[in-house]
Amino acid sequence: WRYSDKGSAGAAENHYSTMSIKDICALPVADITADDCVLFLWTTYPMLQEAMTLIAAWGFKYKSIGFQWLKLNRGGKGYFFGLGRWTRGNTEPCLIAIKGKPCRYVQSQSISQIIEHPVMRHSAKPPLAREKIIELMGDIPRIELFAREGAAGWDCWGNEAPETNIPAPEPPKRKDTSGQLSLFEI
């Protein structure tokens, strides 16, 4: 999504094309998700209010923080200090929201919210998040929107996901959405 601070070298627009909140809210997410499903939504703290708006626009209800990515420097030593007007951002939350009444597939009761992982290319998320989602929810159908890269076992959509030839901004329609999980990287 678009931030108001476009002049910064770290601005998303300097790394990839972005969409407005209005356009993201208008995506036909209902066409690619089951009536009863779970959403894992990455956001940043300056965009937390917009993330809640997006959750509601897509027909989901906020439940909890799924993960808190504590960003390490690229070499893995010391904490990464990102941008920030008040404090320097070095964590990124992944929210959990639900649509309908999804089965609680919880496979493990030992999943920690904390993910410590070095930063990667802009907006790329730690692979451990996908692993934790599968450990938590089981190996059920799942799709990742705005994927920066493909991942085994995940349907991916986005103008940078290598396994897709689907043009942005309209995501693919899925035939079988039973038990669908969604992980959105915005």
Segment roles from a protein language model:
Residues 1-186:
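Class I S-adenosyl-L-methionine-dependent methyltransferase catalytic core
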